[in-house]
Amino acid sequence: MAESVASSESLPQMKPEEPESKKSPSREAIPKDMPVVNVRDIMMYVENMEGMENKKLIPYVVYLDEQFKEIVQKRRKDARVVFIFMIAIMSMLVIGLVVCGVKLLGYLMEQK
């Protein structure tokens, strides 16, 4: 029994947990008004850089670059144009299907 008492005394004691009121330094370092940067925008920017040796960029540094802003704006405009184009094509297809359905229905009604 003396051995079991000695072994229990050698166990490390747990320290009381400190309150989590301390904020992480990373949260304090980033201001709330800093704009959010999309990772896909950064990757696209890096892919479009020609002749640049260092392609490992820090997002908040890249965001300040005018070329980055221009590329992102151009990509967003292109995405809007493609979206509008797809909506137009889909609406034409739906209208075409409705017209074909009506004509087929009229043809079938005449057959009876």
Swiss-Prot record:
Q: How does it sit in the membrane?
A: Single-pass membrane protein
According to UniProt, the name of this protein is Uncharacterized membrane protein ECU04_1080
GO cellular component entries: membrane
Q: Which UniProt keywords are listed?
A: Membrane, Transmembrane, Transmembrane helix
What residue spans carry the Basic and acidic residues bias annotation? 15-31
Ranges annotated as biased composition (Polar residues): 1-11
Species for this entry: Encephalitozoon cuniculi (strain GB-M1)
Where does it live in the cell?
A: Membrane
Any stretches that span the bilayer, and where are they? 81-101
| Major place of residence | membrane
Q: Where is this region: Disordered?
A: 1-32
